[in-house]
Amino acid sequence: MILSVFFYMFLLHIRRLDCFVAVQDSKTLFKGSTLINDSHGETLVSAGQRFELGFFTPNGSSDERRYLGIWFYNLHPLTVVWVANRESPVLDRSCIFTISKDGNLEVIDSKGRVYWDTGVKPSSVSAERMVKLMDNGNLVLISDGNEANVVWQSFQNPTDTFLPGMRMDENMTLSSWRSFNDPSHGNFTFQMDQEEDKQFIIWKRSMRYWKSGISGKFIGSDEMPYAISYFLSNFTETVTVHNASVPPLFTSLYTNTRFTMSSSGQAQYFRLDGERFWAQIWAEPRDECSVYNACGNFGSCNSKNEEMCKCLPGFRPNFLEKWVKGDFSGGCSRESRICGKDGVVVGDMFLNLSVVEVGSPDSQFDAHNEKECRAECLNNCQCQAYSYEEVDILQSNTKCWIWLEDLNNLKEGYLGSRNVFIRVAVPDIGSHVERGRGRYGEAKTPVVLIIVVTFTSAAILVVLSSTASYVFLQRRKVNKELGSIPRGVHLCDSERHIKELIESGRFKQDDSQGIDVPSFELETILYATSNFSNANKLGQGGFGPVYKGMFPGDQEIAVKRLSRCSGQGLEEFKNEVVLIAKLQHRNLVRLLGYCVAGEEKLLLYEYMPHKSLDFFIFDRKLCQRLDWKMRCNIILGIARGLLYLHQDSRLRIIHRDLKTSNILLDEEMNPKISDFGLARIFGGSETSANTNRVVGTYGYMSPEYALEGLFSFKSDVFSFGVVVIETISGKRNTGFHEPEKSLSLLGHAWDLWKAERGIELLDQALQESCETEGFLKCLNVGLLCVQEDPNDRPTMSNVVFMLGSSEAATLPTPKQPAFVLRRCPSSSKASSSTKPETCSENELTITLEDGR
């Protein structure tokens, strides 16, 4: 026996000597070779030195547990992406990784005990197998030396980490570590949803813990970002965002990224920052309310409240004792039946609840109006709630969603909310309105009562009395709030008039439906902006100041406060509320809500930390931060946003005031078109219109609009061309660039183009990052857009195609642009303080707005 053990150890030693040179700093292990854990630390390293395979002890533990794993090469601390024997650690230092006689990969100890193997079909005598560590981190077992004959691979047997090159399908799961230093299977599993396509789920043991949302479904704030969905699909699937197909991203952007199911229950996406540290880009669930159905059925979650969970009005906890102790999983149930005996419909009502997340509805259909949608729910005793939306106003397409089962996964919040009308029995309404802060964590929430005229006159009197009292108290509260606001300016329209202005006319909306963005209380906005403090002022626009605000949970917003009496200001307010609410695109700024209280008229937008495009490209220092690739992405993003407005949105819209100061930049420098106050809607086959009131910004208006008042989609194309040329040159169109010729930037660009010296227009800050061919392509497109004849200008769909083209030589040759002289010859008597005279006698109303 002793002799046999000695002989076995001798063989291991010989095998180690045979393979040591082949293993250390190698990417391949052949049959009969071994990788031994000892003081030498033998490892397999991928060809490009990106990944390494070897034995490790988790997170520097001092115990004897040894695991075979793969980690990023030469990166500290160790970032392990795959573990072989996660359930069976080797408990001594004598552990060996080898290819067994039957062709399987094995982890064994010095006594030959097997701790892990691949479990694949044994190889034939003639088939030689080898194991190779690829540069993408995939460990592959290959037959006959042919990399196409993959017998087994770690990418199809992951642990807790997903790497570029893997593909998430219905059979793949990511299982978390048990703890920070224990790689055995933990409590959490990430996988594709087996019931709904392209959705993802985190399971906590056998319970659903988190579920992603998909853009285009009814509602879901936990939408999986497009970049991550694309990553998980191995860059093969076409992903849609807001019902629009999104073009593929560059796979090179994912080189140093990983997706991990953590032991804490979070799905996390990381990118290597500067090749040294992992930056967390995305994680879900991000808070307690992001956990699936955190408050149970008919329970609403808001992690910013003192009490995270509350039962909906008219509901009570199923298990009160547990609820009081903070266990909300049991949810809530109705205090009263919603139908009478034998299913007879009685006087039920609906509460309007603004939610940012709710479980999927059970059915949907096209309804002519909200009244029809409400009736569908009311006439069905199983109906718990409904929601209504006008999907396409021009074609009168509407949607009605119905919930027949208990509502779950309810989450309230400020941003991105939708209205869901909860069915409640009449007796429960009065008690809710009167008791203010309820017994089960019900906050003081304004409740909209939709009264159904089937209940008795006595019930009507009770409800109307309660409602009247509530409205009176709310108005007194608002008047008190208005008293604290400085009255430096007085606005000309009443609250009633402006609300009628919002909900009237061109959209033909049902007044009870209103618009698609929430209305906020003035008190909320005053608190968010520190009572419109000057310290929070971002800038002064043509229609009023813009302030930075902070909602609970560090949600940043931008608040535009309408300035003194202005026809343009009121028109802008109406446009931005009722128009932007209907638009959703990644390159359009998002309207989050509005407020009309007394004389105050406020618009709430998503906050853009990097202000506007002009803030960067016209500043000698800041322009260095926008390299050529970033400017190309910005130009393409603006083009896609305009294409959506002109062609792909539910409304066909002309912006009429596109300029660099109206292009806002988010945290990742993605462009967002803003300021739709001057926008116009075109319906049907309408392509152009005329106006006697020319509004816009000097230097960006097309000649036919500035001189004749004629505007069309090609007017926006002209403005886009100016923005393109300004972006690539770093020069303003309204400045003098050739004083002796008195040319605008467009004229200067045209002269350089004709002389085949277009590259001289390049912003000096782009000398190192720009490619000549790419620059000339953008200049070509810009000049095509500013041609004098609108019929010669391309459509935005053609512009997007040309910008995506790889060959500039195939683009059309531009014709002469519309030159605009900046000033007439100065009189010799003019003093230095005299304002320059304009050559045109046309009266122009010009808006000069600072970027937020």
Curated annotation (Swiss-Prot):
Q: Where in the cell is it found?
A: Cell membrane
Outline the segment boundaries, as ranges, of region: Disordered. Answer: 826-852
Which residues does the entry place in the Extracellular compartment?
A: 20-444
Annotated stretches, region: CaM-binding: 621-638
Residues of the signal peptide: 1-19
User: What residues are glycosylation sites in this protein?
Assistant: 37, 59, 171, 187, 234, 243, 352
Residue list for modification Phosphoserine? 566, 661, 674, 831, 840
Supply the InterPro entries for this chain.
Bulb-type_lectin_dom (IPR001480), Bulb-type_lectin_dom_sf (IPR036426), EGF-like_dom (IPR000742), Kinase-like_dom_sf (IPR011009), Pan_app (IPR003609), Prot_kinase_dom (IPR000719), S-locus_recpt_kinase_C (IPR021820), S_locus_glycoprot_dom (IPR000858)
Which residue ranges traverse the bilayer? 445-465
Topology feature Cytoplasmic, residues: 466-852
Start and end of every Protein kinase domain? Answer: 532-819
Residues covered by the PAN domain: 339-426
In this chain the EGF-like domain maps to 285-321
Task: Give the Phosphothreonine positions (modified residues).
Answer: 691, 847
**In which domain of life is the source organism classified?**
Eukaryota
The annotated regions of Polar residues compositional bias extend over 834-845
The catalysed reaction is: L-seryl-[protein] + ATP = O-phospho-L-seryl-[protein] + ADP + H(+); L-threonyl-[protein] + ATP = O-phospho-L-threonyl-[protein] + ADP + H(+)
GO molecular function (one): protein serine kinase activity
Stated membrane topology is: Single-pass type I membrane protein
Q: Name one Pfam family in it.
A: PAN_2
- EC identifiers of the protein: 2.7.11.1
Q: Which GO terms describe its biological process?
A: recognition of pollen
Entry keyword set? ATP-binding, Cell membrane, Disulfide bond, EGF-like domain, Glycoprotein, Kinase, Lectin, Membrane, Nucleotide-binding, Phosphoprotein, Receptor, Serine/threonine-protein kinase, Signal, Transferase, Transmembrane, Transmembrane helix
Q: Which family does it belong to?
A: Belongs to the protein kinase superfamily. Ser/Thr protein kinase family.
Q: What's the protein here called?
A: G-type lectin S-receptor-like serine/threonine-protein kinase At4g03230
